[in-house]
A protein has these predicted regions:
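Cytosolic covalent-transfer regions centered on His/Cys nucleophiles
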Residues: 1-158
């Protein structure tokens, strides 16, 4: 499995500076909407609820401007991901206290715990690379950001 198998370009968004994403809740709502893009059931409201419940346990802001909101749903047919890039930054209660610029959300069926952990590890490895994060932040739109992820996963320089 590669990330672009569960992350379509329609689920990637680059938010304009000063756009509607100015808080953690705004970011979670935007991610839920992206995750719900094309979904019938479960939908956006379920996705938002799961992300908020997970954030209530502990922030998924892992530092270096990155957050990986995630969770599991009983009736989800397969893994789904969304990417939200906020060049202006979002306060997110990250572990390092800094704002978050890159939010990569993943939802998984409850029965797929192993798959979920592998996906989170894959995202973490990808976003550990400072130069890759800078390229994502410089992406003009979601399609370009999606292409950068695809290239990185194919082992080509992004």
């Amino acid at each position: 499995m590669i990330l672009t198998d569960i992350l379509s370009s329609e689920r990637v968004r680059v938010a304009a500076r000063g756009a509607h994403v100015q808080s953690k809740d705004d970011a979670l709502r935007a991610l839920a909407a992206l995750l719900g893009n094309g979904a019938t059931a479960p939908g956006e409201a379920d996705f938002y609820r799961v992300l908020v419940e997970r954030e209530a346990l502990q922030s998924t802001g892992i530092g270096d401007g990155v957050a990986i909101p995630h969770g599991a749903l009983e009736n989800l047919p397969g893994q789904v991901a969304a990417l939200l890039i906020c060049p202006g930054g979002v306060p997110f209660d990250a572990i390092d206290g800094g704002p978050v610029y890159i939010l990569f959300a993943v939802l998984t069926p409850k029965r797929a715990t192993g798959e979920h952990l592998k996906t989170l590890a894959r995202i973490s490895r990808l976003l550990r690379d400072t130069s890759f994060r800078q390229k994502l932040l410089a992406a003009a739109d979601g399609r370009e950001a999606h292409g950068l992820i695809r290239l990185a996963e194919e082992g080509r320089a992004a």
